[in-house]
């Protein structure tokens, strides 16, 4: 009759080895989870940046390309529809801007709506009656630390409405023809608002070149990490917007 061997427990060394292996696996799991959270956060930040850039450029393009629009061209002309008023020192002028001041340039766009024609203002509203719309885009400080700004729009001199946050700079150039001896209306220069004012080119602006700069959502996440890639603090996006009333496209 065989003798039954007595049961033995784990020795202290075996327990310590098991605990060490468990801690190693747990550490790997926590590192994986932390990495996934960082990745998801970075992807979310990039998606938000793309949405902000797309929305900002769409709002700016919808308004700027409508500059100079007026209904019933058989009755009105640009000169009669948009007389001298405020910053518009020339009859028929539909664009005006400022440059050089922090945190960025500003642009003011004027056009008319006939009512129920689907023409929108910078806040996305349409109108049921004929209205003159003066839209001013600029950056406004949000009062945060560190200081951040938002793209805002003021309609007909009213209080500015915040459109997009996270914008750090707005640079605007205006496409004009400065060579008066050549034929046609081809753009030969992109000038700042100051240069356009000095040359008296506002009535002949055919396009607008926008550069919007946003805070880079990946900049903070890359600090303290060893990487061969330099992560910029900001990201800039550029777009050229044609003024349809000037380039022969019906609005």
Describe each model-derived feature in a short phrase:
Residues 2-69:
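Aliphatic-rich helix starts adjacent to a transmembrane/signal segment
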Residues 9, 39, 45-48, 69, ...:
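Residue-level preference for alpha-helix termini and adjacent loops
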Residues 44, 48, 52-58, 62-67, ...:
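Short linear sequence signals and composition-biased patches located at protein termini or domain-edge surfaces
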Residues 80-143, 152-154:
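C-terminal globular interaction/adhesion domains in large, modular proteins
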Residues 145-147, 204:
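Short loop/turn segments at connectors of secondary-structure elements within structured domains
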Residues 147-155, 179:
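Short polybasic amphipathic segments
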């Amino acid at each position: 009759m065989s003798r039954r061997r007595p049961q033995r427990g784990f020795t202290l060394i075996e327990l310590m080895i098991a605990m060490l292996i468990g801690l190693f696996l747990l550490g790997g799991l926590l590192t994986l989870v932390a990495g996934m959270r960082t990745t998801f956060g970075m992807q979310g930040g990039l998606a938000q940046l793309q949405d902000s850039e797309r929305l900002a450029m769409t709002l700016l393009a919808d308004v700027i390309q409508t500059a100079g629009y007026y209904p019933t061209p058989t009755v009105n002309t640009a000169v009669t529809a948009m007389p001298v008023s405020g910053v518009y020192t020339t009859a028929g002028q539909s664009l005006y801007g400022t440059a050089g001041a922090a945190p960025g340039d500003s642009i003011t766009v004027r056009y008319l709506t006939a009512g129920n024609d689907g023409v929108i203002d910078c806040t996305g509203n349409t109108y049921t009656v004929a209205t003159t719309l003066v839209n001013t885009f600029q950056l406004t400080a949000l009062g945060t630390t560190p200081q951040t700004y938002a793209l805002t729009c003021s309609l007909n001199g009213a209080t500015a409405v915040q459109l997009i946050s996270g914008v750090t700079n707005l640079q605007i150039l205006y496409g004009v023809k400065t060579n008066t001896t050549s034929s046609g209306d081809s753009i030969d220069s992109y000038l700042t608002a100051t240069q356009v004012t000095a040359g008296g080119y506002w009535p002949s602006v055919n396009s607008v070149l926008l550069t919007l700069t946003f805070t880079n959502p990946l900049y903070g996440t890359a600090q303290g990490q060893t990487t061969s890639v330099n992560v910029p603090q900001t990201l800039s996006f550029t777009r050229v917007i044609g003024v349809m009333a000037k380039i022969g496209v019906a609005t």
